[in-house]
Amino acid sequence: MFQPASMPRFCRLAIALFLSLVVLTACGGGGGGGTPPPVSSTLSFPMLSGYRALVANGASHNFTISGTCTGSGNHTVGAANIPTTFEGSYALSGASTWTMNLTACSVSSLASTATTYYDSNYQPRGFYSVGNNYGVYLTAPTIPATVMVGNTGTIGTEALYTNSSKTVGNGTNVLSYVVEPDTANTAIINLISRAYNAGGTLIATEQDRYRIDAAGNLTPVSADIQYSYTSTTHLVLTF
């Protein structure tokens, strides 16, 4: 059964790092030959500077939904330019909003808002989604300066709580990445978030894919969300 109260927990992965977005590659042009196979580029891609630019400028993208539920929606992330305090020290913040209109589902619409907090270099520090989760990185996340196809790594672990008092734990998100082939001049950065409940059981895996070029421009491709444990819900958001 689709559970709207849980949805922001996993979609917010996009909020917490990189903004969000199965590589169902953008429908290629007409003609009949289908989509060409991916190419392993030999270029180096500036992942860190591309990420910083994306966070600093904000973005808004529409998407379609397939899988257990179908529909469409929008994800808007405001530029992280609001000075504030997070966990007792200076931070920059930006708000992110998800809206979804659903069919063939137990709910017809969803909407959620979260605020993500960054240091002065746009390194993510945590987030707060009222009524859902308060997340804090256990240590500063590691985002590589440059990557190549085939690279993998762990970015960080985010502790989740029910609210900012941090008195009740609500699990963890473990974030990693894989750089996948795409074209001779681009690659796909696959951000993988594994969400665990407070008992340490895996409850969902989200894969957010972005296309990156040699200049560091990041373009959302899709988000693939697979629930587990008490649900078999599978959602694919294609941007």
Listing of model-derived features with the role each one plays in the protein:
Residues 2-15:
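Bacterial N-terminal signal peptides that target proteins for export
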Residues 2-4, 19-46:
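Bacterial Sec-dependent N-terminal signal peptides
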Residues 104-127, 182, 202-219:
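A short, surface-exposed beta-strand/turn
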Residues 77, 135-142, 173, 206-209, ...:
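Edge beta-strand at a domain terminus
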Residues 70-77, 106-111, 168-174, 202-206, ...:
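Amphipathic hydrophobic-ligand
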Residues 88-90, 97-110, 161-167, 196-203:
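Short, cysteine-centered beta-strand-loop-beta hairpins and adjacent loop/turn segments enriched
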Residues 135-200:
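Short helix-loop boundary/capping segments
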Residues 32-89:
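N-terminal cleavable signal peptides for secretion/export
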